[in-house]
Curated annotation (Swiss-Prot):
The keyword RNA-binding applies. HAMAP family: Ribosomal_uL3_B. One of the primary rRNA binding proteins, it binds directly near the 3'-end of the 23S rRNA, where it nucleates assembly of the 50S subunit. Methylated by PrmB. This is Large ribosomal subunit protein uL3. GO terms for molecular function: rRNA binding; structural constituent of ribosome. Belongs to the universal ribosomal protein uL3 family. It comes from the Bacteria. Part of the 50S ribosomal subunit. Forms a cluster with proteins L14 and L19. It comes from Pseudomonas entomophila (strain L48). The keyword Hydrolase does not apply. Keywords: Methylation, Ribonucleoprotein, Ribosomal protein, RNA-binding, rRNA-binding. The modification N5-methylglutamine is found at Q150.
Length: 211
């Protein structure tokens, strides 16, 4: 897997092409990713680079975390992320910035979707509602049957039912990088990405890139 970067969703806006076409874009702020550890096959069994972003007060860092950051000689961040590597070498303290990507490149963006709380099957799974009239009584939004009778005598795993919606890891694939603002550490990506404004997102080169 190719290395990516960790950023923060700043919100959405739009830009115009020279032809006057409006393109909706998500602005992602790419704070410099500080390398905290470089893992090798000899010592860890696989190749990977571990990074952190942002800052965290010393009172909010455990002793183990503080020692890990101190060993890498980097400031404590708000978390650690890891990217598998096939080639290339990094050292603790190296910086990875928005220049890793170029305009026109396709990327996959991973984030935590907005939590919707407890939701019914119509909202959560796009079920159709039942008849409003024609003898239907207080069953307008119920899901209906959830299985058979004595055989098999149970509800199959994975059955679509009411439950907690959102607040889960989501990846949107093959989004286009419209613009890279290296001076302000910004990526402008076409379309929407998962999560709320201010949430952490991971941007990687697309695994299904065309061409």
């Amino acid at each position: 897997m190719t290395i990516g970067v960790v950023g923060r969703k700043a919100g959405m806006t739009r830009i115009f092409t020279e032809e006057g076409v409006s393109i909706p874009v998500t602005v992602i702020e790419i704070e410099p990713n500080r390398v905290t550890q470089f893992k090798t096959e000899e010592t860890d069994g696989y190749r990977a680079v571990q990074v952190t972003v942002g800052e965290r007060r010393a009172s909010r860092v455990t002793a183990a975390q503080a020692g890990h950051f101190a060993k890498a000689n980097v400031a404590a961040g708000r978390g650690v992320w890891e990217f598998r590597l096939e080639e290339g070498d990094f050292q603790a303290g190296d910086l990875i910035k928005a220049e890793l990507f170029t305009a026109g490149q396709l990327v996959d963006v991973t984030g935590q979707s907005k939590g919707k709380g407890f939701a019914g099957t119509i909202k959560r799974w796009n079920f159709r509602g039942q008849d409003n009239t024609h003898g239907n009584s207080v069953s307008h939004r119920v899901p209906g049957s959830i299985g058979q009778c004595q055989t098999p005598g149970r509800v199959f795993k994975g059955k679509k039912m009411s439950g907690h919606m959102g607040a889960e890891r989501v990846t949107v694939q093959s989004l286009e990088v419209v613009r890279v603002d290296a001076e302000r550490n910004l990526l402008l990506i076409k379309g929407a990405v998962p999560g709320a404004t201010g949430g952490d997102v991971v941007v990687r080169p697309a695994v299904k890139a065309r061409g």
